[in-house]
Curated annotation (Swiss-Prot):
The name this protein goes by in its record: Phosphatidyl-N-methylethanolamine N-methyltransferase
Reaction(s) catalysed by this chain's protein: a 1,2-diacyl-sn-glycero-3-phosphoethanolamine + S-adenosyl-L-methionine = a 1,2-diacyl-sn-glycero-3-phospho-N-methylethanolamine + S-adenosyl-L-homocysteine + H(+); a 1,2-diacyl-sn-glycero-3-phospho-N-methylethanolamine + S-adenosyl-L-methionine = a 1,2-diacyl-sn-glycero-3-phospho-N,N-dimethylethanolamine + S-adenosyl-L-homocysteine + H(+); a 1,2-diacyl-sn-glycero-3-phospho-N,N-dimethylethanolamine + S-adenosyl-L-methionine = a 1,2-diacyl-sn-glycero-3-phosphocholine + S-adenosyl-L-homocysteine + H(+)
UniProt keyword Lyase present: no
Species per Swiss-Prot/TrEMBL record: Saccharomyces cerevisiae (strain ATCC 204508 / S288c)
Biological pathway: Phospholipid metabolism; phosphatidylcholine biosynthesis
Length: 206
């Protein structure tokens, strides 16, 4: 059984063109985006860089939101373009894999879009780093089924596209997406908790 699993993994790996410049660019874009928005958000929190540049916290947040959204569009386009050049693999092609890909992509989009609807622009795009805090924690769907629906939904969407197209390279990119979001959460969750703890502490001292 172990040998068969190893053979499957080897076949999937051999179906990835690691030398493709578009594939490499897709990896770079996937890694760059969360690093970028975390660095910019930290700079905003400590130095109010975007607030000063844009003439207000809300305007600064909207600027960051537009930038992150645009970078996401570019990343998705690069991903799609990279997959077109990559070979398919018989291990993940066929009607069932296609249906699974559609289902995962659909689920991912539901999580992403419903999360954005619940949080709004400032809640989705790091408004708390600008001092734009939510009154209370959102607990309704999709947050009652997922702790981080934006990140998990995005990962599922990448995975769904990979399976729909039968491209092992897409599985690699999806794995990078997953691990980059895991790393991002290690930065974001404690920092966000600190921001709200400071807000609550300030309220008590008033």
């Amino acid at each position: 059984m172990k040998e068969s699993v190893q053979e499957i993994i080897q076949q999937l790996i051999h179906s990835v063109d690691l030398q493709s410049s578009k594939f490499q660019l897709a990896i770079v874009c996937t890694m760059f985006n969360p690093i970028f928005w975390n660095i910019v958000a930290r700079m905003e929190y400590h130095k109010h860089s975007l607030t000063k540049m844009c003439g207000g916290a809300r305007k600064g947040c909207y600027m960051l939101a537009a930038t992150i959204f645009s970078l996401g569009i570019v990343r998705d386009m690069v991903y799609e373009s990279a997959l077109r050049e990559q070979p398919t693999c018989s291990l993940i092609t066929g009607e069932n894999w296609t249906k699974l890909g559609v289902a995962l992509f659909g689920l991912g989009q539901v999580l992403v879009l419903s999360s954005m609807y619940k949080l709004g622009i400032t809640g989705t795009y790091l408004g708390d780093y600008f001092g734009i805090l939510m009154d209370e924690r959102v607990t309704g769907f999709p947050f009652n089924v997922s702790n981080n629906p934006m990140y998990q939904g995005s990962t599922l969407s990448f995975l769904g596209i990979a399976l729909y197209k039968g491209k092992p390279a897409g599985l690699v990119v999806s794995a990078v997406v997953y691990f980059m979001y895991k790393i991002a959460l290690r930065w974001e969750e404690p920092f966000t908790a600190m921001i709200y703890a400071n807000r609550d502490k300030a309220k008590k001292n008033m």
